[in-house]
Amino acid sequence: MGFIFSKSMNENMKNQQEFMVTHARLQLERHLTMQNEMRERQMAMQIAWSREFLKYFGTFFGIATISLATGALKRKKPAFLVPIVPLSFIFTYQYDLGYGTLLQRMKSEAEDILETEKTKLELPKGLITFESLEKARREQSKLFSDK
């Protein structure tokens, strides 16, 4: 009788473990999906912010360019045109980010770094392990207990 009882307990235990593994897998998949959704939303917000900024900065850039060009022509001083150069870099960068291919170029560069330059991505003392965390926790608790 004990054998039959233990056999059914083993089956129940096995079923429970399978359920837990399946549940953990589902939880992990949901978590990864949620993280990806959050990343996509953050990227969309960044692009939207860049486009919105471009509207205001583009207006400022246009007015500044016209004003500086007019001042340079009226006063016959080409030095008035100098501020247009850095403003044009900012305008071009924001346009490229909002409507151009900057994000695709950054993505391909990041993928290239991940594939070919792995050593630059390593942590200084390697991956954090449970043992290293426990060691640091013990050392920290010793400091507090000594005081």
From Swiss-Prot:
Per the UniProt entry, the disulfide pairs are none
Outline which residue ranges sit on the Cytoplasmic face. 74-78
| Ranges of the Extracellular topological domain | 1-52, 100-147
Q: Which GO terms describe its biological process?
A: chemotaxis; inflammatory response; positive regulation of plasminogen activation
Q: In which tissues is it expressed?
A: Expressed in monocytes; detected in differentiated monocytes but not in progenitor cells. Expressed in adrenal medulla and hippocampus.
Instruction: Spell out the GO cellular component terms annotated for this protein, sorted alphabetically and separated by semicolons.
Output: mitochondrion; plasma membrane
Question: Which keywords appear in this protein's UniProt record, sorted alphabetically?
Answer: Cell membrane, Chemotaxis, Inflammatory response, Membrane, Plasminogen activation, Transmembrane, Transmembrane helix
Q: How does it sit in the membrane?
A: Multi-pass membrane protein
Where is this gene product found?
A: Cell membrane
**TM helices/strands, residue ranges:** 53-73, 79-99
**Top-level taxon:** Eukaryota
State whether it acts alone or in a complex, and with which partners, per the record: Interacts with PLAT. Interacts with PLAUR.
Q: What does this protein do?
A: Receptor for plasminogen. Regulates urokinase plasminogen activator-dependent and stimulates tissue-type plasminogen activator-dependent cell surface plasminogen activation. Proposed to be part of a local catecholaminergic cell plasminogen activation system that regulates neuroendocrine prohormone processing. Involved in regulation of inflammatory response; regulates monocyte chemotactic migration and matrix metalloproteinase activation, such as of MMP2 and MMP9.
In Swiss-Prot or TrEMBL terms, this protein is called Plasminogen receptor (KT)
User: Could you tell me which species this protein originates from?
Assistant: Mus musculus
Q: What is the lineage of its organism?
A: Eukaryota, Metazoa, Chordata, Craniata, Vertebrata
Gene giving rise to this polypeptide: Plgrkt
